[in-house]
């Protein structure tokens, strides 16, 4: 499973100019081995999940200020491989990954998802019923050059905070499942979003207002399709086929403007920001 190590997170404005750099190396006292998923903080800063240690890893939540400077750290009362992470507005954290015995090479591990308090205490463990077609979906996982990769077999693949204070969390499955999870760890709602075409599988999603925008990839025709659905019911409202290459990474969605934002590397490894309007 390919994951980044200690690369920074860059915040850019609507013109693509860098406004802040969130670098986990700034927390040098933690001797981090890797830093992975990140989530916006309610104060304009950023949370990022990070790890140090080998056989007994220590899982930290790094808190950056809005200007990118290090603010604080939280040590989670847990030891597992984290792949999905998101922060609630009130300070609790949703963390999902795999627990395994690292001393046993044959241990494939088990899924583990929990909500932790702002001071690192485990508040609730969550369990999810495996979707009927999740194994098939994992076998046909879309290849998007690592830009929108969802790890096979995990409970959860992507998460964003809603205006209601709950997290909206996507599962890599067919049909797509989106869970609405409260700060206490209660699963408030489960929505199904149908794939736009046979063989199309989810690669990313974003939440804006009362709309979900999900990006699907079809290996057969190498095409991306974006589906907009109702964030309360999962009902499909519209779908948009991508006849040209908008970029592999679906970065943002604005329901009010009807604008989808994609990222890709251009010439000289410069980041290109591409915006597409719904038509």
Predicted regions and their residues:
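Short loop/turn segments that connect beta-strands within beta-propeller blades
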Residues: 13-17, 64-69, 117-121, 182-186, ...
